[in-house]
Amino acid sequence: MARVGFIGLGNMGGGMAANLAKKGHDVRAFDLSAEALERARAAGCLPVVTAAEAAEGAEAIITMLPAGTHVEQVYAQSVLDAALPSAILIDCSTIDVATAKRVAEMAAAKGLVAVDAPVSGGIAAANAGTLTFMVGGSKDAFRRAEPF
């Protein structure tokens, strides 16, 4: 299975990261909340100290953050510099279209591939692993994101 960097372990991200770990992925999980990190550890994820540490060496980097400003900030300050050139960036946050496009452009400027992949289904579906993803990006980016 793959190494996955997961950034944002709140109500939705915590369940999503746990399900990736259950599927056998090596999940490096980051959140500002110590409680969220402990829940991730209990679910089989490896808690890390920074977003950059979550991104380092990951085949896929998934963000699930509260707002577009958070996504832009974590990409600019951590993800884009730490990501492997071959990594797929998957933002599952519910953010506005303009921000999603800016984030994708930021990734492309660094030679990285990104998809916008907000979800539907709520906390119960995140915990059950039954979320519906609405993915925007190139066909190649979609193909690379699909296993995650």
Predicted regions and their residues:
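NAD(P)+-binding Rossmann beta1-loop-alpha1 motif at the extreme N-terminus of oxidoreductases
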Residues: 1-62, 123
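Rossmann-fold dinucleotide-binding core
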Residues: 4, 9, 94-148
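Active-site-adjacent beta-strand anchor residues
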Residues: 30, 64, 93, 135-136
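Acidic, glycine-centered active-site loop in nucleotide-sugar glycosyltransferases
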Residues: 42-44, 77, 84-86, 127-130
